[in-house]
Amino acid sequence: ASTTLTPVSEGDDPAIAVASEAKPAAAADLSTAGAAFGEETLDWMHFSDNGASPVSRANGTAINSVRFDAGRGFSDYVALSWNDGDTEASNSGSTNGTCTPGSITISVIVTPDTKHILLYTGAWKGTNTVEVYSQGGSLIHTAQSFSGDNTSNRQLVTLNVDAEESGVLVIKINLSNEWDDGSNVSLAALAVTGNSAGTAADAD
């Protein structure tokens, strides 16, 4: 499913033009997540190893912070790999992630070169709703909600970013319509893609 939104003018705050949701492929490479759009991967973070510290892209600077209200591990997401991590240099396909019975709050620094934010997220025994806010707290976009029953519903939520100037987006993944105490929303990974400002200079 996809939702088209007229960009919201909020001074220098970035706007979200389109949000789409789709079943993720059985496997994906976070290091090359931007290739599907003809872009570079600017940053990524993976919440792996059943609740252990997350693995980040080495030298990544776009993902400012990620906070789970309360987290526990799971191991049934699609296989996500990488080859440019910091604390774990490479992984051939981790299916782990972190889930919470509350909400997940993500802060991402965006610039005019930022084009997409990819959320590898899910829901189990409840409903997942992704909301995007400006740095000042204004709601910019609400993605289409999706629900999971006794089988986890895994989705790749893609946010198309339109930022005229640098700023911050705050993304919240919220749980609602809980079935029982085990209901949760999850985040296995996220990636930020776009055009690297230093590409041309680095090529010289």
Regions inferred by a protein language model and the residue ranges of each:
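Boundary/junction segments of secreted and surface-exposed precursor proteins
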Residues: 2-51, 197-204
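Non-catalytic accessory regions used for complex assembly or targeting
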Residues: 11-27, 46-51, 55, 103, ...
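Surface-exposed, low-complexity/disordered Ser/Thr/Gly/Pro/Asn-rich loops and linkers
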Residues: 61-107
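Short beta-strand/loop motifs in extracellular/secreted proteins, especially
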Residues: 78, 102-104, 115, 126-130
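Contiguous ligand/interfacial binding patches
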Residues: 99, 122-195
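Generic recognition of flexible, low-complexity loop/linker segments
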Residues: 104-108, 118, 158-159
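Extended extracellular/luminal ectodomain segments enriched in beta-structured repeat modules
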Residues: 110-118, 166
